[in-house]
C-alpha cells in the first residue's frame, strides 16, 4: 500500500507551470466532492445532464465533472461529482442555487427512483498543483493519511520532479488537503490526470518500478499511509477552466 502512495507522489509533480493567465489552467481553490452508487449509470448520467442544462443552473456556469469510478477499494461508490470553486463566495452561491432549484429537486427524485445511494461527501482544497489537466479524461486518485507532513511533502515533490522526464508521466497532478468529510481516516488526496485510461494504466504499471520511487518509499516510511485508490473516468464535464 505504501508503494502505491509513494508512487502517486512521484508522478504528480512532473509538469511545472503555475496558472498566471487564462492561457494556462486556472485551478480551483475548493472542491466539493459527492460519492454515490448508481445501479443504472445511463439514467444517472442523463438526469445529471438534464439538471445542469436547467436555466437556473446553466446560467451560473458552475465548473463540474461527473466521474465513473473504477477499482474503488474503499466502499460501493460507482460515481463521483466534483464541483470546483475559485472562491468561498462561489461555493456559497452554488449551495444557494441548488437548494432553491426545482430542477435539483427533480434530479434527487430521479436518482431515488433508480436506486441511487449517497456514500460520502468531502470538501478539499488544492495545496499543490502542476501541469495542465484540461481535456484529460482519466484521473488516478490516492487518498492518504499523512502523519508527518514535513517529511512527506518534500519527499513527494522530489520524487515527482525526478519523474518529469519519463514518457509515461501524467499530464497534470494535484495534492489536496481534506477540510471536511475525512472522518478521521485521511488527511490528503493526490490526483494525476491522463488523456485516457490506457495512459493511466501505463503509468500505474511503470512508476513504482523506478529507482526514484524505491528511494521515496524508504524516505517516507512511517510518514504516510494509503487509505484508498481508484480511477475516475469523465462522463460529463461543464465549464472546465
Predicted regions and their residues:
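Sec-dependent N-terminal signal peptides
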Residues: 4-13
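Sec/Tat signal peptide C-region and signal peptidase I cleavage site
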Residues: 13-19
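Short S/T/G/P-rich N-terminal loop/turn motif that feeds into the first structured element of a domain
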Residues: 19-215, 219-241
Amino acid at each position: 500500500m505504501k508503494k502505491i502512495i509513494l508512487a502517486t507522489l512521484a508522478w504528480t509533480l512532473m509538469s511545472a507551470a503555475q496558472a498566471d493567465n487564462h492561457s494556462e489552467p486556472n485551478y480551483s481553490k475548493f472542491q466539493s466532492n459527492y460519492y454515490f452508487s448508481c445501479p443504472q449509470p445511463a439514467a444517472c448520467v442523463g438526469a445529471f445532464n438534464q439538471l445542469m442544462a436547467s436555466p437556473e443552473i446553466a446560467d451560473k456556469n458552475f465548473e463540474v465533472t461527473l466521474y465513473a469510478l473504477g477499482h474503488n477499494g474503499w466502499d460501493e461508490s460507482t460515481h463521483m461529482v466534483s464541483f470546483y470553486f475559485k472562491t468561498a463566495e462561489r461555493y456559497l452561491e452554488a449551495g444557494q442555487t441548488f437548494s432553491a432549484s426545482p430542477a435539483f429537486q427533480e434530479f434527487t427524485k430521479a436518482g431515488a427512483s433508480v436506486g441511487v445511494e449517497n456514500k460520502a461527501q468531502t470538501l478539499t482544497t488544492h495545496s499543490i498543483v502542476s501541469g495542465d489537466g484540461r481535456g484529460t479524461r482519466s484521473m488516478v486518485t490516492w487518498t492518504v493519511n499523512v502523519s508527518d507532513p514535513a517529511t512527506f511533502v518534500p519527499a513527494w515533490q522530489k520524487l515527482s520532479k525526478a519523474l518529469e522526464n519519463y514518457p509515461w508521466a501524467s499530464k497534470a497532478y494535484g495534492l489536496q488537503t481534506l477540510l471536511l468529510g475525512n472522518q478521521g481516516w485521511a488527511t490528503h488526496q493526490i490526483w494525476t490526470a491522463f488523456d485516457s485510461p490506457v495512459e493511466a494504466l501505463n503509468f500505474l504499471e511503470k512508476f513504482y518500478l523506478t529507482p526514484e520511487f524505491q528511494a521515496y518509499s524508504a524516505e517516507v516510511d512511517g510518514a504516510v499511509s494509503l487509505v484508498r485508490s481508484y480511477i475516475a473516468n469523465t462522463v460529463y464535464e461543464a465549464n472546465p477552466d
